[in-house]
Amino acid sequence: KVYLILIHRKNTIMISENNLHKLCLIYGNQKLLVDETVDSIIKERLEGRPYEWALERFYSDELLKNKGESGKQNIEDLLISYETLPMLTDRKVIRIDNFELVKKPSKNSGNNNQHLLYETVEKIINNPPDNMWFIFTSAATREQDFSKPLIQNIKESGLIKKFTAYEN
């Protein structure tokens, strides 16, 4: 068995090869700790594999923009990444930043991108493919900042790690 142990102050995470969570939410206002934890999770999942083929990163704020506003990413790109097999490798990690922006829109909001993003992420969380791992990150400091149904599903089958300098 291979073990990776992260130790920083009072926080310890132990990950074994048999216990690689498909879904990870890493959040908090301690950006360095969030980034170090995410980097170590990615390194563990993609050990010996080329990152350029096996790692994709999306930003929720970019995904929520209309097509004319953003030439970078759109929700269809995320859906395609989710639905296609990894290329030239046996596994893929998809990182989605600003996870606090993924919320179910109110019925009269009229924001189609918000609805599409929520449905796509809900689909990912409810049925992650065998050869893919998903890491969600956020600078939010409270669990209430996230969509309740999404965070509940991550709690049931994934890893949630919070790094904050203070408690409210």
Feature locations, PLM:
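Short hydrophobic targeting helices and cationic amphipathic motifs
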Residues: 4-6
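Residues at the beta-strand->loop junction immediately N-terminal to the Walker
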Residues: 27
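Non-catalytic interfacial helical region
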Residues: 16-24, 32-168
